Structures are given as structure tokens and as C-alpha cells.
Amino acid sequence: MTVININEIMTHLLPGQTIAGLDLGTKTIGIAISDMGLTVSNPRPVLQRKKFTEDAHRLIKIFDHENVGVIVIGLPLNMNGSSGSRVQATRAFVSNMKAYTKIPFVFWDERLSTIAAERSLLEMNVSRIKRARRIDSAAAAFILQGALNRIENLHS
């Protein structure tokens, strides 16, 4: 497993592979998977966090099932661009995943992704209870969609 730049994604993907998006929280992990054409991000059920080893095994199972070739993970920078404790936790998570997968990771600035996801769910009239259950995967989909749009712009 390695960390790559968004510009390198296409050189790491094999035909038919997808890209995963992750929104790492303290209690949950939001997950999204791209379509095969790498144009649309699709949210998946939220993973309730347990112990790291168990989380890693459950994620790897999902990545294998979805034929994931690259993982885009949200980097929760502060609004001024500085790194806080959540950035350190995200980097540590990716570093710890080295023992479980060779799939490369891409860090993606996730500032305002949860707010955008919340607005989107509100516009769809999703109830407060359902929003709470879906917000992290919606944020993961927002993160992944931003990366997919960037990839499309790089290759057009």
C-alpha cells in the first residue's frame, strides 16, 4: 500500500476496477464506490467502527467485492488549511492499513463535505434519523465525486 497523488490514479487502475471513497469518523466509516466508468459515486452502507483490525478486515472484504483499485480518503483539514488531530488520525489509519492491503490511497481535501452531504439529504427530505445514519456515506460519496470530477478534468 502506498499513498499516491490524484494525478497518478489512472496508472494504478486495471481495466474494470473501481475507486472507493472513505469518510473516516470516530464512530463510523462512510463508504462510497465509483461506477465502472469512473464517473459516478455511489454511497454504500456506513460501517460502525469497532477495533481497527476488525474494521480493516471488513473494509478489505468490501474492496475485494467491489473490485477496488484505488481508495480516496477524506483528509479533514481545518478551514485555514492547517492539520489538526483528525488529520493525524486519518494519516495513522492509512499507515496502519499497509499491513492489510496493497491498494493505493489518495488523500482528498474533505473540507465542507459533511455540510454539502447534509444539504443534499435535506433537499431530498430525508428524515433527521435517516440523515444521521446516512451522513457519513453521503460525505464519502461527495469526497469521491470530487475526486472523480478531478480525474475527468485531468484526462479530457
From Swiss-Prot:
Gene Ontology molecular function: any one: nuclease activity
SUPFAM superfamilies: Ribonuclease H-like
Principal location: cytoplasm
KW Cytoplasm (keyword) present: yes
InterPro entries with a match to the protein in the record: RNaseH-like_sf, YqgF, YqgF/RNaseH-like_dom, YqgF/RNaseH-like_dom_sf
Protein location: Cytoplasm
Catalytic activity, EC: 3.1.-.-
Keywords of this entry: Cytoplasm, Hydrolase, Nuclease, Ribosome biogenesis
NCBIfam families: RNAse_H_YqgF
Biological role stated in the UniProt entry: Could be a nuclease involved in processing of the 5'-end of pre-16S rRNA.
Stated family: Belongs to the YqgF nuclease family.
Cross-referenced HAMAP family: Nuclease_YqgF
UniProt-recorded name of the protein: Putative pre-16S rRNA nuclease
